[in-house]
């Protein structure tokens, strides 16, 4: 196949899908609902009775609106199938049972799912099924574009009615970030007015305040939540001490969801989020400077003052409606801006690492997503969609360095400043067409085709077939299997366009030549699993997966800044096995997950300038473990509701250790963290009324463990897990 024919195919499928969508759009629309006139008639009617048990007009209106929203929510959910994939869900009740309740960071919520591996905050917090990142976040079915610092730290679990993690062989509508899809349904459909205020205080100067407000007025409903956190441990401690040095952080985030019913079949939704996070970069005492700065005394390593700021904002405007009785659709317009700014200590960074780099990475993206479902007949449901995105990224790098000889030895104590700025614009286009075929009462097949094209540092495209099968073997026993061809463009906000030539003859000279044209990852993914419902309380699950990869993407921290850059291995092999079980009754709930995985790759094919020659040579001839591979990971938890106002919870997190050493040839020791919490409600009477309290104890046995030791492929500073910490949370719920 020649190059031109490969490029033509995505356009052909896109035209076909667009034509299909247009045909549905031209169909006759169903008669408009008479809901508005009915509401007006109700508003004019006098009250029939003063009996408080008789529903008021306002209450009846709320019920009617809630019913309409429920139908629209169900229709929207049908736009996002999961046939053939693995799904692990957390309801808001499940999240409330975690040690920190709904104050649990979203990454830590996901850590309770099978196949999720813990890493440091700077590295993204978690890895799913052998991928470094490659997670897609969706709110009400709309994919959020990538952010420089990732969405996990931007989204708040308080906002979620349900969080689902989809993995495996995903249907054709899911593209680009496919290690896992974090699908979030919001609390925006509450049928009453109210809110909550909570405060949390605890170890290491942890001070957090949060508030939410929700309600409705006629056809308009809203849910708004915001929080502010201050802590003395914003990033993992690089030492084993209980209290890190220079690690303060201030984190602010807000999320809002608004929905307006236009009629029985249509609604407009707006959801938006903003974060503003500031971090001190923690210090390591007892180090000695490597370089000398003219007329400046040595700076103690515990007094280095480097900082980083991360900001992000997104907005999504979605219109949902239907055409006739068989067709539902949603079109969403989105916008996202984000930036990360590393501010070095001009003396400390320079004298200890030979470079003080003021680095700003910013990225903005906007586009649209269109999804359509047409129920052709009882056996076939056709789904189609389009995705288009335009983004612009900028990297500003003002590096102060020392002149150096060919061996990297400092030749002058007077530094020079080198500007290395770059701009990158790109676009992404995608289209899909798929059919959910109910072959019989036991068997459902979802087959489809996806076409994608990306233009950033390279122009690439791919046709991606998808196939998923679900078979009900017996009552309570369901088998699923799937195949997916994946196409993963590089995250443009993490493409490093460093100029190697500019830094020759300096203390920031790079070890090898550059290839900054990060390529799209291409993989064949196979997944098979079985779920067994023992009864209506207890379920078991087993899932196995394997992935063959070309141009495997990874990310690494190269330098002092907590900014990650993407690069490619030429080949990759990733696979694993997951076991899970859940149990739920009225007072006792529990879960347990165990996962075994392997993730290996060979041959660095882009970003070679970040690696030493001996490391490049070894990786070229050996299958090396990826730095985020953890052979065994496990989590288990138990929650017991003693009475209507008292709940006890606990969980255990285990990891066999991430990779370390030269070319990731060894791994860190295993680690276990045990966590407990007690939640108790009190009725204080008077103006205070009911108050909910929660005491949480994290890492109860104060285990000292390293997530990273600073060695390994593309690994930055050492990072230790959180030491024993105690938190007290007070929450006041109120009605309006």
Predicted regions and their residues:
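Gram-negative outer-membrane beta-barrel transporters
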Residues: 438-440, 541-548, 565-660, 731-733
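Periplasmic N-terminal accessory/gating domains of Gram-negative outer-membrane beta-barrel systems
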Residues: 39-52, 56, 64-74, 78-127, ...
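Short strand-turn segments of transmembrane beta-barrel domains in outer membranes
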Residues: 153, 162-171, 181-216, 224-226, ...
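C-terminal beta-signal and adjacent terminal beta-strands/loops
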Residues: 234, 645, 659, 680-736
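Transmembrane beta-barrel wall of Gram-negative outer-membrane proteins
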Residues: 201-230, 241-282, 307-328, 376-379, ...
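Membrane-embedded beta-barrel scaffold of Gram-negative outer-membrane proteins
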Residues: 322, 328-342, 472, 494, ...
């Amino acid at each position: 196949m020649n190059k031109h024919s490969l490029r033509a195919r995505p356009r052909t499928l896109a035209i076909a899908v667009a034509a299909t969508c247009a045909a549905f759009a031209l169909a006759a629309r169903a008669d408009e609902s008479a809901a508005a006139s009915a509401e007006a008639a109700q508003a004019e009617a006098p009250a029939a009775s003063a009996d408080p048990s008789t529903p008021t007009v306002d209450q009846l209106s709320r019920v009617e609106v809630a019913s309409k929203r429920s139908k629209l929510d169900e229709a929207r959910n049908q736009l996002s199938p999961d046939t053939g994939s693995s799904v692990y869900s957390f309801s808001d009740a499940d999240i409330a049972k975690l040690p920190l309740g709904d104050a649990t960071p979203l990454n830590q919520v996901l850590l309770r799912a099978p196949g999720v591996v813990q890493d440091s905050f700077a590295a993204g917090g978690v890895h799913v099924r052998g991928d470094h990142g490659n997670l897609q976040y969706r709110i009400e079915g709309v994919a959020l574009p990538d952010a420089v610092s990732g969405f996990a730290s931007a989204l708040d679990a308080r906002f979620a009615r349900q969080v689902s993690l989809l993995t495996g062989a995903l249907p054709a509508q899911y593209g680009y970030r496919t290690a896992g899809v974090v699908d979030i349904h919001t609390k925006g459909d509450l049928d009453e007015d109210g809110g909550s205020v909570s405060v949390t205080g605890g170890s290491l100067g942890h001070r957090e305040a949060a508030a939410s407000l929700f309600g409705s007025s006629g056809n308009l409903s809203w849910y708004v939540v915001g929080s502010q956190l201050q802590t003395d441990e914003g990033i993992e401690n690089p030492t084993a001490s209980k209290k890190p040095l220079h690690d303060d952080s201030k984190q602010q985030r807000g999320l809002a969801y608004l929905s307006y019913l236009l009629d029985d079949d249509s609604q407009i939704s707006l959801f938006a989020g903003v974060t503003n996070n500031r971090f001190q970069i923690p210090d390591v005492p007892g180090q000695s400077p490597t370089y000398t700065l003219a007329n400046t005394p040595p700076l103690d390593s515990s007094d280095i003052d480097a900082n980083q700021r991360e900001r992000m904002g997104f907005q999504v405007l979605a219109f949902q409606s239907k055409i006739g009785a068989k067709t539902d659709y949603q079109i969403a317009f989105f916008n996202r801006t984000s930036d990360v700014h590393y501010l070095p200590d001009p003396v400390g960074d320079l004298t200890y690492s030979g470079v003080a780099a003021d680095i700003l990475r910013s990225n903005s993206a906007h586009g649209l997503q269109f999804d359509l479902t047409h129920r052709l007949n009882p056996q076939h449901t056709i789904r189609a969609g389009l995705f288009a995105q335009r983004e612009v990224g900028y990297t500003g790098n003002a590096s102060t360095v020392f002149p150096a000889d060919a061996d990297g030895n400092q030749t002058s104590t007077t530094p020079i400043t080198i500007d290395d700025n770059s701009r990158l614009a790109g676009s992404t286009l995608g289209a899909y067409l798929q059919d959910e075929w109910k072959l019989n009462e036991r068997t459902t097949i979802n087959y489809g085709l996806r076409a994608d094209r990306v233009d950033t540092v390279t122009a690439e495209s791919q046709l991606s077939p998808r196939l998923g099968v679900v078979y009900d073997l017996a009552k309570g026993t369901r088998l699923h299997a799937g195949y997916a061809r994946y196409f993963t463009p590089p995250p443009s906000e993490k493409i490093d366009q460093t100029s190697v030539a500019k830094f020759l003859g300096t203390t920031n000279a790079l070890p090898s030549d550059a290839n900054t044209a990060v390529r799209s990852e291409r993989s064949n993914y196979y997944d098979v699993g079985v779920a067994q419902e023992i009864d209506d309380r207890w379920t078991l699950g087993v899932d196995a997966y394997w992935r063959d990869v070309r141009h495997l993407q990874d990310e690494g921290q190269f330098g002092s800044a907590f900014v990650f850059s993407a690069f490619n291995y030429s080949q990759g092999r990733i696979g694993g096995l997951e076991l899970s079980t859940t149990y739920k009754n009225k007072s006792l709930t529990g879960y347990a997950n165990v996962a075994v995985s392997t993730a290996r790759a060979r041959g660095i094919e882009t970003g070679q300038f970040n690696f030493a020659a001996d490391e490049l040579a070894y990786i070229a001839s050996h299958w090396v473990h990826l730095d985020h591979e953890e052979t065994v990971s496990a989590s288990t938890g138990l929650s017991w509701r003693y009475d209507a106002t008292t709940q006890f919870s606990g969980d255990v997190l285990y990891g066999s250790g991430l990779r370390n050493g030269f070319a990731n040839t060894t791994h860190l020791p295993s680690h276990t963290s045990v966590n407990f919490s007690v939640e108790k409600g009190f009725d204080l009477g008077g103006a205070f009324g009911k108050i909910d309290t929660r005491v949480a104890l994290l890492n109860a046995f104060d285990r000292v463990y390293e997530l990273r030791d600073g060695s390994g492929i593309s690994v930055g500073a050492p990072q230790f897990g959180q030491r024993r910490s105690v938190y007290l949370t007070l929450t006041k719920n109120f009605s309006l």
